[in-house]
Amino acid sequence: MEKFEIPLPTGGIISGRLSFPTTPRMPINLPLIVCIPGGSYDAEYFDVDEDYSISSSSAWAGIPTIALTRPGYGSSTPAPIDDTDQNITYGQVQGKFLNSTILPALWQEFGSRTGATAIVLLSHSIGAMISTIVAGSYTGCEGYPLAGLITSGIGTELAEGPQKAMLHLLEEATGSIQFEITPKDAIMLQVPMQNLTDQKMCRHTNHLNRPVPPGELHDINTSWLGYWRTYSDRITIPVMHGLSEFDGLWTCSPKILEEYKAAFPASPKVTSEMILQAPHCIELSLQSKAWYMKCCAFALECVRWHVLLSESAPMSVRPGSGERGTEEGLSQKGITTLVYSTTKVEEAGL
C-alpha cells in the first residue's frame, strides 16, 4: 500500500496507507473500504507485508482501500477536544472528529478518484468502538455516503484478567503507554500458547507496537460498555461483526454473539459470528486472508444495498388497493411495511 497524508479543513493532517486498483475488475458499484485500527497500532496493522495486507484481497476484488493512522498516532493530528463538555469520552471525541471532518475529507479527496459509490468502515478493537460511534452519529448530511460497518476484536463482556492489567497500567501511567511486546503478543496473538499465527509475524510485532494514548484505554475498559448502546441503537446500515474464538481481551460465546447482534435493532442486516481458531488480532493471524475476503464480499453487498435503496423511493399504500395492507394498519399489528416504486415489499419487525 502507498503512504499518504492529506490536509484537513480544520487544520492538521490525516495520514495512512491506500491501495487503489488501476482498473476495476467489472463495471459495478464499488465500496471505498476505510480501515480503522485498534489501540497500539497505526495504518501498518492492515498492511504488514504482502501476505498480511488487506490490499492482497481488496486488489483482487477491485476494491479501493484506505487504512488510517488514527488521530493522535504518528503524523495524524490529534482530535480537537471540546473543553466545555466534561462528560465526553475519548472515543466520542475521535468518533465525532472522524464523522464530521476526516471521512468527509477522505471522500472529497478520493471518492471520485476511485470511482467508489460509498464508504464501508472496517474496524478493529478500539477502532471498532470509534467506528460504532461514527455510524451511530451519522446522519447523511456530513458530506460522505456511509453504506456499511465491519467490527472485530470487540464484544459485550471484557475478559476480567486483561481488564485488570490494563487498569493497573493506567494507574501508573504519566503519559502514553508503551506495551511490553512479550505479554502483548500473548494477549493479542496467543503466542506461544496457541498455534494461531505464522511464526514470522512475531518478527513484525515489535515495530508494529505504537504508544497508546491513555484516554482510549480508559474509555474501552471503564466506560464503553455503559454507553455503547446509545450509538448501536441508532445504526441504520448493515453490520458485520467477528469475535475470535481465542480473543484475549473479550469473552467469546454464543450468548455474547447474540447480545452483540441484538444491539443493532435499526440495522437492516446484522451478522455476528465466532472466528474459529483466531486470536484477538484476526488480521495478524492465520485467519487473516479468510477474514479480509469476507470483509470485501460484505462491503460489495453493502454498496449494492445502498444503491438499490437510494433508487427506490418509498410511497404510501392506499387502503383497499389490494396490496398486503396499509402502512398504518400493519404498524398497529407490529409490522412495518414499506412499498417501493418497484412494487417490492420490504417487511421488518416481524
Features from the language model and the residues they span:
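Conserved alpha/beta-hydrolase
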Residues: S55-T77
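Conserved loop-alpha-helix segment in the C-terminal half of the alpha/beta-hydrolase fold
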Residues: E245-S272, A278
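Conserved hydrolase catalytic core segment
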Residues: S125-T151, E157
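Alpha/beta-hydrolase active-site loop
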Residues: Q86-F110
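Short, surface-exposed "cap/lid" segments of acyl-processing enzymes
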Residues: R25-S57
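N-terminal cap/lid segment of alpha/beta-hydrolase-fold proteins
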Residues: M1-P24
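Alpha/beta-hydrolase
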Residues: E160-S253
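Catalytic histidine-centered segment of alpha/beta-hydrolase-like enzymes
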Residues: A278-Q287
